[in-house]
């Protein structure tokens, strides 16, 4: 059913005085708020009940209507005039203030691009001087020739002499016009002339201008009234025509053209939106409803009030004072001063912070004006509209819940009873334990046993949502079925901690209760903890077991020769388990089990079943119990080919088991990597729910056997290692030699440093290798077990424990040349400890900075891509996107192999190998097998479907997007892929380094920024720091390279025999040599490319490929895998606008920025009508700028630059069609994604199905 409350669009415009009066319920005349004795609102004041409505429902202010009676609705009290209605109207009824003098709106005057100045073609500074009563302006030229219309008479600066001269000349003309030396005005004119000639003598400008006006018809003005007069005279149509003629004049400089285009945009916007420029000057200002700016009584009888009330009071007081001053007939200087103060008071109300001297409180803090209420993190948009507080939520510390199933979370009983209170009360009433709500509440207070029964029943039907801040990706909120637990901590399943990035060292989590039927169904069908097996950023399992679970399964699958019970053969699983339970065999003993006792689906060869046994251990029997019968038997760490690998462990009964054991090598246990592979493979064959069930069994096994393994760690496990001192001796000699060379001047400082660092790095590597060998000999050493299994720690930690700590970083992040020779076991000396503090401290500071930086990056990414949603199945695009392996050309190593780029995408066209054999049809989903086939065929590049070439007007289609990595199936219609892309790029942001990796000044290498700063540089499209590459503007051949002492000049000859010269910076590293052929956009020197240049010379496709390659390079270097498609979505948003260079015969204006889709529509329309189509130029916007260019003004205003975005939207009279997610959230609509787009029917059926099954 269509939601009738759903708002379709929202429009913003300038309000004209009549509109403001029509909104108003009365004029506010007095600055009073409430009476200090009666605490009632003052009549005609800022809280007057006659204007804004009653403070209590259906009660008037005088007491005549005391009892709240809804029957009186709509009546007015005969005595005090208050309308009897609900008090809620005080949140919506507005008042107004009639201003004694017009004032300009500060946004239109002072927010760049200064709109009023643009309309009047004045400098913003001059216009401000007019508005604030510093300078006069010419309103009408009359029949004098010295002053032109709109000229500003500047009396405050160096231009005063010029103004004096012009006034003298004009007054001389006036004397000629009077033509009577004895006339009173002639004498006045002569006196003025004398005053004007002597620059030290002051003169009255008012006197001079009134005299000139009297005889020449010229008009002068000052203040907002003058501005209003000029704006009223503006004829929008004539102005537009005039500017178009000026633009055709080719002699204009680029700056002049830009200024003209800005003016043209303003005039055109006003004309199209049917608004008048004079509305930018206000004669009436609205007073917002009183409940939005309340006055609140504090304890002790004092009051606190919203600061907006103070700003309104100042306006009313000054307005009244201006009235009085006028009535008294005060001199113009006093009147003008009052007018200026009124203008400033209105400015303070609208945007106090923009004023040079904001109105301050006693504590020197500026008062919060209407603009400050809107903008920033604490503003209306971000604080109240995009994120709201909810009614049913709880928060507590989390603790591990090892006995929970993957779909469960433990809720403390007290927390649950409070959260589910309304449902418990309902249940008690339905089951007739309580007659009404009051009795039920009493039962709750008294802890009646029935209450707990009710709670147990209620929670069966309602999952809860658990959230851990910061919510960096969609798995930061998951749904669980609640299970009541004792204590006050929320219990969390150990395997979901990775997704939440939670640990149990005091982390807290929030609980939310889905209330409506649809919300409950969505939680169950889409968000249950047991369905979140894969991480969205790379499609790899995110629920990988860690620590004790790995340790337990490692111990379980270890094989040991000569252990108790070795060589026994069992006829059934139960027999083997009984033998283990009774202590006859060791868990890791090599034993045989009859093949007939095991499920036959697990083995490929059926014939051997009756006369063979499998060589294994009891541990592996337990381990294989957790998989179902269709999953191959795991007997070694060959997981991908397990069914074949198991064959080598099958022997005939005729072969003596003890001989067999003697002649074989023990198998490696199952480690962390193998467990991950098992989970991925299980997910592929069994789906999410079955995998969750298997994981729970794996967890139980892991915990159980890590306990039984009795792994401990003590100083005795840390082997002593004395061999290192020989290495140190040798290294010290080398260092001494290097220092001698340096002292003799044979090495530079940086070379010395580099060589010393190399010496110590080699020593540490040597010690590490030797230690690894020593450690491997003792297979049962608990430290080795932990490192080898992947449960905790690595060999480098062990090296620091017993070998040496090695080289440390200094505060800049560079490596120090003093090594730490001690290990932790020996203990560090004081100086060594001091050396190691720098790096550690920098690490902590970096993490804090990085978290904030990475969070802000995510916010900007979400803002740029939030409107992208999957809207249909196939857009049938005209072109595809060619991909090949991403290779770092400098070091010639593969960054992203082709296979990774193909899996999960659709082909665009049929793919053939070199022998013209068909490998894959067009529009086929490429899975691992097809990708493997493509690679084996020797194909190096493939044209695939991509979001970059998707032809949808809004959003993308299923085939251009491909697989949803979180579910490993084709993406659903309604999936908000833009937000997921932003989260997938932003979430690993905290793992990126803050460091710009510099090469420490080593010759021949170019400094390249990396880590988070490089990502920001690419996505914000800023000029790269460090070396900027020179790129070729033309196709051609390098004819010669001239070398002028390290500065090169590269000559490129084009096909037309033109020579293009490029001069490099000193000591640049060249990427071309003589005879190289180059294409436009190709690098000639090392360094980062400026994206604006690349777009201009190379084109859109080059930019797309470059950003994709560079972003992948940064993430892959840190070992983070991110799917191409996410980066493509962001690139699509950065490049989806064009700038009109020539409007042709369309309605588009030069300089206008529109989306490529809209541009294509206009062009097609022009072709159909046979008129000249517009011309355009591709644009690239960084992720800071792109959201501000969004078609939705609500979304842009809530991002950044609120005042500027709103001003622009107002001038255009923009209508927001509510197509993105943010704008719908703000208006309380369902978002146009997921079930908000497709309806909840399917999800409700799914939820019903899941509710009946366990997982």
UniProtKB/Swiss-Prot annotation:
EC number: 2.7.7.6
Enzyme class: transferase
Annotated binding of Zn(2+) 1, by residue: 60, 62, 77, 80
Cofactor(s) listed in the protein's UniProt record: Mg(2+); Zn(2+)
BP term (GO), one: DNA-templated transcription
GO molecular function, one term: DNA binding
Pfam families in alphabetical order: RNA_pol_Rpb1_1, RNA_pol_Rpb1_2, RNA_pol_Rpb1_3, RNA_pol_Rpb1_4, RNA_pol_Rpb1_5
Cellular component aspect of the GO annotation: DNA-directed RNA polymerase complex
Keyword Magnesium: yes
PANTHER family with a match to the protein in the record: DNA-DIRECTED RNA POLYMERASE, DNA-DIRECTED RNA POLYMERASE SUBUNIT BETA
Function (record text): DNA-dependent RNA polymerase catalyzes the transcription of DNA into RNA using the four ribonucleoside triphosphates as substrates.
HAMAP family from the UniProt entry: RNApol_bact_RpoC
Family indicated by similarity: Belongs to the RNA polymerase beta' chain family.
The name this protein goes by in its record: DNA-directed RNA polymerase subunit beta'
Encoding gene, per UniProt annotation: rpoC
């Amino acid at each position: 059913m269509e939601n009738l409350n759903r708002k379709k669009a929202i429009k913003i415009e300038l309000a004209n005085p009549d509109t403001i009066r029509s909104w108003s319920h009365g004029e506010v005349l007095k600055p009073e708020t409430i009476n200090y004795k009666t605490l009632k609102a003052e009549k005609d004041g800022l809280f007057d009940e006659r204007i804004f409505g009653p403070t209590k429902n259906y009660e008037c202010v005088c007491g005549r209507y005391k009892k709240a009676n809804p029957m009186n609705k709509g009546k007015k009290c005969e005595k005090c005039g208050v309308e009897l209605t609900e008090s809620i109207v005080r949140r919506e009824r507005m008042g107004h203030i009639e201003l004694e003098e017009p004032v300009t709106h500060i946004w239109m005057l002072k927010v760049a691009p200064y709109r009023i100045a643009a309309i009047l073609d004045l400098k913003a500074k001059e216009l401000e001087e007019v508005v604030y009563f510093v300078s006069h302006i010419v309103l009408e030229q009359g029949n004098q020739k010295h002053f032109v219309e709109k000229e500003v008479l500047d009396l405050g600066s160096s231009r005063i002499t010029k103004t004096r001269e012009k006034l003298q000349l004009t007054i001389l003309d006036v004397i000629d016009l009077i033509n009577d030396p004895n006339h009173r005005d002639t004498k006045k004119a002569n006196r003025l002339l004398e005053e004007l000639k002597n620059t030290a003598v002051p003169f009255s400008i008012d006197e001079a201008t009134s005299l000139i006006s009297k005889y020449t018809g010229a008009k002068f003005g000052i203040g907002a009234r003058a501005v209003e007069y000029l704006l009223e005279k503006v004829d929008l149509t004539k102005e537009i025509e005039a500017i178009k003629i000026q633009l055709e004049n080719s002699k204009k400089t680029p700056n002049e053209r830009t200024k003209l285009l800005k003016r043209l945009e303003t005039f055109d916007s006003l004309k199209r939106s049917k608004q008048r420029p004079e509305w930018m000057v206000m004669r009436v200002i609205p007073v917002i409803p009183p409940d939005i700016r309340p006055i609140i009584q504090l304890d002790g009888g004092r009051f606190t009030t919203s600061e907006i009330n103070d700003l309104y009071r100042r306006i009313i007081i000054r307005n009244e004072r201006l009235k009085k001053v006028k009535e008294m007939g005060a001199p113009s200087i006093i009147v003008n001063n009052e007018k200026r103060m009124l203008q400033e008071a209105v400015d303070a109300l609208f945007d106090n912070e923009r004023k040079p001297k904001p109105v301050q409180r006693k504590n020197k803090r500026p008062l919060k004006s209407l603009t400050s209420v809107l903008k920033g993190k604490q503003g209306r948009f971000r604080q109240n509209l995009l994120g709201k507080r909810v009614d049913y939520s709880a928060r507590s510390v989390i603790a591990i819940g090892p006995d929970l199933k993957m779909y469960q979370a433990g809720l403390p009983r007290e927390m649950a009873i409070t959260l589910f209170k309304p449902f418990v009360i309902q249940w008690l009433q339905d089951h007739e334990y309580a007659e009404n709500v009051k009795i039920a509440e009493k039962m709750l207070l008294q802890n009646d046993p029935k209450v707990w029964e009710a709670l147990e029943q209620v929670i069966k039907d309602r999952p809860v949502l658990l959230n851990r801040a910061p919510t960096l990706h969609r798995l930061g909120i998951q749904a669980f079925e609640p299970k009541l637990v004792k204590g006050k901590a929320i219990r969390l399943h150990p395997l979901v901690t990775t997704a939440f990035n939670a640990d149990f060292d005091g982390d807290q989590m929030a609980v939310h209760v889905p209330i409506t039927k649809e919300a409950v169904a969505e939680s169950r069908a889409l968000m249950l903890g047991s369905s979140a097996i894969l991480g969205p950023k790379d499609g790899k399992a995110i629920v990988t077991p860690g620590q004790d679970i790995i340790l337990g399964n490692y111990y379980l699958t270890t094989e040991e020769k000569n252990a108790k019970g070795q060589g026994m053969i069992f006829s059934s699983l139960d027999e083997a388990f009984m033998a283990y339970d009774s202590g006859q065999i060791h868990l890791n003993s090599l034993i045989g089990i009859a093949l007939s006792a095991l499920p036959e689906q697990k083995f490929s060869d059926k014939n051997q079943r009756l006369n063979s046994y499998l060589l294994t251990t009891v541990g592996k029997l337990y381990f294989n119990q957790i998989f179902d019968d269709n999953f191959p038997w795991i007997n070694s760490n060959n997981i991908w080919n397990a069914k074949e690998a198991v064959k080598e462990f099958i022997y005939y009964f005729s072969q003596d088991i003890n001989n067999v054991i003697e002649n074989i090598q023990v198998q490696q246990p199952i480690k962390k990597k193998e467990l991950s592979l098992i989970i991925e493979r299980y997910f592929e064959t069994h789906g999410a729910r079955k995998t969750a069930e298997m994981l729970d069994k794996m967890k139980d096994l892991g915990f159980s056997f890590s306990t039984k393994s009795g792994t401990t760690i003590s100083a005795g496990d840390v082997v002593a290692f004395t061999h290192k001192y020989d290495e140190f001796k040798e290294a010290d000699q080398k260092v001494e030699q290097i220092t001698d060379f340096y002292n003799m001047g044979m090495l530079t400082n940086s070379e010395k440093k580099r060589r010393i660092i190399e010496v110590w790095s080699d020593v540490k590597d040597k010690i590490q290798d030797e230690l690894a060998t020593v450690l491997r000999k003792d297979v049962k050493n608990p430290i080795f077990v932990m490192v080898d299994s992947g449960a905790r720690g690595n060999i480098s930690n062990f090296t620091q424990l017993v070998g040496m700590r090695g080289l440390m970083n200094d505060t800049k992040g560079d490596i120090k040349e003093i090594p730490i020779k001690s290990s932790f076991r020996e203990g560090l000396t004081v100086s060594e400890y001091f050396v190691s503090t720098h790096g550690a401290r920098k690490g902590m500071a970096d993490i804090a900075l990085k978290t904030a930086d990475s969070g802000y990056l995510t916010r900007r990414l979400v803002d740029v891509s939030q409107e992208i949603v999957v809207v249909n199945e196939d857009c049938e695009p005209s072109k595809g996107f060619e991909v090949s392996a991403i290779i770092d050309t400098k070091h010639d190593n593969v960054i992203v192999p082709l296979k990774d780029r193909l899996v999960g995408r659709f082909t665009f066209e049929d793919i053939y190998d070199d022998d013209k054999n068909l490998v894959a049809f067009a529009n086929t989903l490429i899975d691992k097998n097809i990708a493997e086939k493509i690679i084996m065929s020797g194909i190096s590049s493939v044209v695939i479907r991509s979001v970059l070439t998707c032809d949808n007007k809004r959003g993308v289609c299923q085939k251009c997007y491909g697989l949803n990595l979180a579910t490993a199936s084709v993406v659903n219609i309604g999936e908000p892929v833009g937000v997921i892309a932003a989260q997938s790029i932003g979430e690993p942001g905290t793992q990126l380094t803050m460091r710009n990796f510099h090469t420490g000044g080593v010759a021949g290498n170019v400094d390249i920024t990396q880590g988070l700063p490089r990502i920001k540089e690419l996505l914000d499209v800023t000029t790269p720091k460090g070396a900027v590459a020179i790129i070729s503007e033309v196709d051609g051949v390098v004819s010669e390279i001239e070398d002028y002492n390290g500065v090169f000049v590269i000559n490129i000859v084009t096909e037309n025999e033109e020579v293009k010269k490029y001069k490099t910076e000193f000591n640049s590293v060249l990427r071309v040599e003589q005879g190289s052929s180059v294409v436009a956009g190709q690098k000639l020197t090392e360094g980062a490319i400026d994206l604006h240049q690349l777009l201009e010379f190379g084109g859109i496709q080059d930019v797309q490929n470059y950003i994709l390659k560079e972003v992948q390079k940064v993430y892959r270097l840190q070992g983070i895998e991110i799917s191409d498609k996410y980066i493509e979505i962001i690139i699509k948003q950065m490049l989806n606008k064009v700038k009109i260079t020539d409007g042709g015969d369309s309605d588009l204006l030069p300089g206008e920025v529109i989306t490529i889709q809209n541009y294509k529509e206009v062009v097609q329309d022009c072709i159909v009508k046979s008129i000249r189509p517009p011309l355009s130029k591709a644009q690239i916007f960084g992720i800071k700028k792109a959201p501000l260019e969004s078609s939705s003004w609500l979304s842009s205003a809530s991002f950044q630059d609120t005042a500027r975005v709103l001003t622009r939207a107002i001038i255009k009279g923009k209508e927001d069609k509510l197509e993105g997610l943010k704008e719908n959230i703000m208006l309380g609509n369902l978002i146009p994604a997921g079930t908000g787009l497709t309806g909840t029917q399917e999800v409700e059926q799914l939820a019903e199905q899941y509710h009946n099954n366990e997982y």
